[in-house]
Regions:
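Soluble secreted/lumenal catalytic domains
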Residues: 10-149, 158
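Flexible, glycine-rich surface segments
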Residues: 129-187
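Conserved small/polar residues in nucleotide/adenosyl-binding loops
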Residues: 193-195
Length: 195
């Protein structure tokens, strides 16, 4: 159902999430796009790209706060978070969507929304939590940034002032062969690119 996610984009914050979702949507098969839009009430996946960030502070979704990142050790090896993390939750959501015939529509709908957001989070270097994650600071043009804050808030706005469509057009440059190779991998495979 979810046929291809292109790994050429970077992204975070609303513009980055929208750009990644747009690139993903452009690479969906027509059948997959139609099925997804059926569950999303006819809306594009871009519409829901930042949804998880919007609901994470509500009582119903507060438990998802740890699900936006992945922890790694000093060697860059993935370390599952006992409270949950992006990788574990993404695997769970994908399994629910793949088993859509045995799930109720609301479960599939919410799982698709989570997948769209988590794929964007997993493309963000600031969402890989190294042991020094909170203490890593750097200065750029006289301003101090934290790693996560820079990637979530500033990386895209300090470079090009593009709309998500422009990022999509500039970054979705994979050849057909590269796209096939990406589609054969799993989200777990793709997440290792940033670790």
């Amino acid at each position: 159902m979810l046929s291809c996610w292109c790994a050429t984009a970077f992204g975070w914050g609303k513009i980055g999430h929208d750009a990644i979702a747009y690139i993903a949507e452009c690479n969906l098969t027509p059948k997959a796009k139609k099925n997804i839009e059926k569950y999303l009430g006819g809306r594009s996946i871009v519409y829901y790209a930042s949804w998880m960030d919007q609901v994470r502070h509500t009582p119903a979704y507060r438990h998802t706060n740890t699900w936006h990142t992945n922890k790694v050790d000093a060697g860059g090896n993935y370390v599952p978070d006992p409270e949950g993390d992006a990788m574990t939750f993404l695997d769970d959501c994908i399994a629910k969507v793949e088993d859509y015939r045995n799930q109720n529509d609301s479960t599939v709908t919410v799982s698709i929304r989570f997948i769209v957001h988590l794929v964007g989070d997993m493309h963000c270097p600031g969402h890989v939590k190294y042991p020094w994650y909170k203490s890593f600071k750097f200065t750029l043009s006289g301003k101090e940034y934290g790693l996560h804050n820079y990637w979530d808030e500033w990386a895209l706005t300090l470079s090009n002032k593009w709309h998500y469509l422009e990022y999509g057009h500039q970054l979705d440059r994979c050849s057909k062969r590269e796209k096939r190779d990406i589609a054969e991998g799993t989200p777990r495979d793709l997440s290792l690119i940033h670790i």
